[in-house]
Amino acid sequence: MLLRPNSGNTLKYGCLLTKRWLTTSKLLYSVEDMKIKIGQEQYRKALEERIDKIPIENYRNFSIVAHVDHGKSTLSDRLLEMTGVIKPGSKSQVLDKLDVERERGITVKAQTVSMFYNDGKQDYLLHLVDTPGHVDFRAEVSRSYASCGGALLLVDASQGVQAQTVANFYLAYSMGLKLIPIINKIDLDSANIPGAREQIETTFELDPNECIPVSAKTGLNVEQIIPSVIKNIPSPVCDVNKPLRALLVDSWHDPYVGVVMLVHIVDGRMKKGMKILSAHTNRTYDVKEVGIMYPDRTPTSFIKAGQVAYIIPGMKNPREALVGDTFYQMGKHEGLEPLPGFEEPKPMVFVGAFPADGKEFNAMDDQMQNLVLNDRSVTLEQKTSNALGLGWRLGFLGSLHASVFKERLEKEYGAKIILTAPTVPYKIIYKNGEEKIVTNPDDFPDNQKHHDVESYMEPYVEAIMTVPNEYVGNVMTLCLNNRGEQKEIEYLTTGQVLLKYEIPTSQLVEDFFGKLKGCTKGYASLDYEEAGYRKSDIVKMQLCVNGEPQDALTTVIHRSQAQARGKEYVTRFKKFLSYQLLKVPISLKIIQKVVARETIKAKRKDVTQRLHAADISRYKKLLERQKEGKKQMKLSGRVTIKNDAYQAFLRRED
């Protein structure tokens, strides 16, 4: 019979020699092998049989908590090889579906993969939920963690605990996940296993004896992980006999089938043809397909409580897929409560976006809309700039989110785009008690008294940084220069220092991480979380050319930085403007007061070059006419600024 599992798994010299999976004899097969051997339909039925026979008590849903480059994707690949989901060496970074994820080494969209495991006595169904680690995608992470019972806490043996490890640990711990510490990269010469154990004990208060030292690259000791997952991580709290309740973990748009949703089935069953109801939009959908990720979409006739699986709901508008939404079976939803965790995404970074060539607006608008369909956390609205023409105002979860969006737009559609400097949402408190959130610098008041403003508030973040001992002074100076306030400092083993600062979000989005890397020679790591609003002395800063404000370059800044920043702005922008026939002043205004100014001298045409030296009256007449012409030009003329100048300035080119 197809469902007989193999009894063992052998590792030799760190290389995987055999794999657990479905087998007809002692010879083992991977997913691809079995599809070819027995045919798609028989394979699907065998898969459903196996899932149906596994009790919920034998389900394990888990994630991997790790800092970037600590080996999360490699470890995932080894686990998939161990359980026969993929052939050894056949794929790498299976769970990173997007090109930008593979290139940057980060996870942007939540993914899952199902695995079968047999310990020689009984079958287990495992769901590995791969989540974004960066704070920009933290809302998606919390939904993904809600579908898990535990997580592997991955620490690099050579680098130790890093900022993102700490931030993600606290999020997982706060949600009650059981954590299993894994020390990775023990095959490196620089590996310090005792130091990593000590850090795990002192930083996370976890038992160092529970740490599993592994090498995800070679496969050494990886076979110890799944038995530990089964032993330590609890099965999901679900009931297959209750009415359907499914939590939406993530969604994406497929050009062939439309919206695909990743869901955690908390109660009941879902099958093809079922009519489901959204708890938050009250819309109904006919389920076109259900299945598991194994590792790609594998259709099944049903999915049941405890599973993390995909559905194709026949949804026409992808923006109706709200992460954290609850779905019921139509007609069996009376008295059911939505699952906790729904929250509308709140953009924290806003940019203006304009096509490099204004003629491309219509084509790029379609491309922009298509990309936004894949990421509901992006807000999009059209806007017009007197400097750059038609464009959009985009809202993102953070600066990394904005950078990833721009990169995907350029790589997937070949679009060339100009992004203005990032801004954050400021809060204005009026004297009558009203509050207003401003996300566009153009809408920020020019004069506090004139607009009856009581005070301004700006958002802050708590930044968590890990740096080597020798660079602590440099980092403290950087934080001080960016208006940071120190909250905590902790000296870790392995020569690392953990710093916590509260920093204005506006300073963070101005390439703070790049500066941090620069002052530590690339050895620092950073993570952060929102820390609320604080009262602040912030002002609107307008760059004017020939007296006309350039709205694409308007920004909001703290008053203490205005003078220096203003001088830098006008000096740098002057470099990108060509000479005109009249004198052009470039000024920086704050509350209608000029705080910095540069002037581009006028081109001078020698109108007297063909005159005879003795013709004085003619000489004076031509000069007078030229002078009068310049007066008229000054009254009616406008300075033409090419898009290249804005692009170079916003890219901070010299």
From Swiss-Prot:
Protein's UniProt keywords contain Protein biosynthesis: yes
UniProt topology in membrane: Peripheral membrane protein
GO cellular component: mitochondrial inner membrane; mitochondrial matrix
CDD domains for the chain: EF4_II (cd03699), EF4_III (cd16260), LepA (cd01890), lepA_C (cd03709)
Positions bound to GTP: 66-73, 130-134, 184-187
Top-tier EC class: hydrolase
Family matches, as Gene3D superfamilies: 3.30.70.240, Elongation factor 4, C-terminal domain, Elongation Factor G (Translational Gtpase), domain 3, P-loop containing nucleotide triphosphate hydrolases, Translation factors
Keywords: GTP-binding, Hydrolase, Membrane, Mitochondrion, Mitochondrion inner membrane, Nucleotide-binding, Protein biosynthesis
Gene Ontology molecular functions: GTP binding; GTPase activity; mitochondrial ribosome binding
Catalytic reactions of this protein: GTP + H2O = GDP + phosphate + H(+)
Subcellular location: Mitochondrion inner membrane
GO terms under biological process: positive regulation of translation; translation
Chief location bin: mitochondrion
Its EC number(s): 3.6.5.-
Pfam families the record matches: EFG_C (PF00679), GTP_EFTU (PF00009), GTP_EFTU_D2 (PF03144), LepA_C (PF06421)
Domain tr-type G, residue spans: 57-237
HAMAP family: LepA
Task of the protein: Promotes mitochondrial protein synthesis. May act as a fidelity factor of the translation reaction, by catalyzing a one-codon backward translocation of tRNAs on improperly translocated ribosomes. Binds to mitochondrial ribosomes in a GTP-dependent manner.
Family per record: Belongs to the TRAFAC class translation factor GTPase superfamily. Classic translation factor GTPase family. LepA subfamily.
Miscellaneous comment as given in the Swiss-Prot or TrEMBL entry: This protein may be expected to contain an N-terminal transit peptide but none has been predicted.
Protein name as it appears in the record: Translation factor GUF1, mitochondrial
Organism: Candida albicans (strain WO-1)
Encoding gene, per UniProt annotation: GUF1
